[in-house]
Curated annotation (Swiss-Prot):
Most abundant protein in the virion. The keyword Membrane applies. Late-budding domains (L domains) are short sequence motifs essential for viral particle budding. They recruit proteins of the host ESCRT machinery (Endosomal Sorting Complex Required for Transport) or ESCRT-associated proteins. Matrix protein contains one L domain: a PPXY motif which potentially interacts with the WW domain 3 of NEDD4 E3 ubiquitin ligase (Potential). It comes from the Viruses. This is Matrix protein. Its main location: virion. Pfam families: Rhabdo_M2.
Length: 202
């Protein structure tokens, strides 16, 4: 029976692809996802639990035989159970993972690397979210390994509160990134004060 587990199994960065090896993952019908859209930064009406973060996100995918986004989505469906970071910032991590995987990957040896650097404004519903000044340095490897395939996700997310002008984060329901957020069970609600604001509930 297939199951998810965290194991120590390093990807070999030094391996060089053989001639003729594709420089991008194999095509799947749900592989290439367009980046989500952002609404322009507007005056936030509700001032409680608003945090401005400078985000750095990177996901390295190691899969010697290529990988399917269906496997990644299956892995992310168990994200709540394997997440090892700060629980007050799990919502931010889920948002960043969705955004990172919406970008185009850069081949790196046997791996594909997705990166994101952005300043985003998050707003949490009452009693949720990080403490004032709280930051996140999250790094984890999550691995799918069965008799047929091996896929390793090396996730790194850095979130530091900053004062650089950013964009207000809001779910675009027409974006395929919503598939990933739905898979991870991202908990949000629309702000009653601002229709362009998605409040995080975790």
């Amino acid at each position: 029976m297939n199951f998810l587990r965290k194991i120590v199994k390093n990807c070999k960065d030094e391996e060089i692809p053989k001639p003729g090896t594709p420089s991008a993952p194999p095509d799947d019908d749900d592989l290439w996802m367009p980046p989500p859209e952002y609404v322009p930064l507007t005056q936030i009406k509700g001032k409680e639990n608003v945090r401005n973060f400078c985000i750095n996100g990177e996901i390295k995918i190691c899969s010697p035989n290529g990988y399917s986004f269906r496997i990644l989505r299956h892995i992310l469906k168990s994200f709540d159970n394997v997440y090892s970071g700060n629980r007050r910032l799990i919502g931010v991590v889920k948002v960043v993972i969705g955004l990172v995987l919406s970008a185009s990957p850069v081949p790196e040896g046997m791996n594909w690397v997705y990166k994101l650097r952005r300043t985003l404004i998050f707003q949490w519903a009452e009693s949720h979210g990080p403490l004032e000044g709280e930051e996140l340095e999250y790094s984890q490897e999550i691995t799918w390994d069965d008799e047929a395939e091996f896929v390793s996700l090396q996730i790194r997310v850095s979130a530091k509160q900053c004062h650089i002008q950013g964009r207000l984060w809001c779910i675009n329901m027409n974006s395929k990134a919503c598939q990933l957020w739905a898979d991870m069970g991202l908990k949000t609600q629309q702000s009653q004060e601002d229709e362009n604001t998605s409040l995080l509930l975790e």
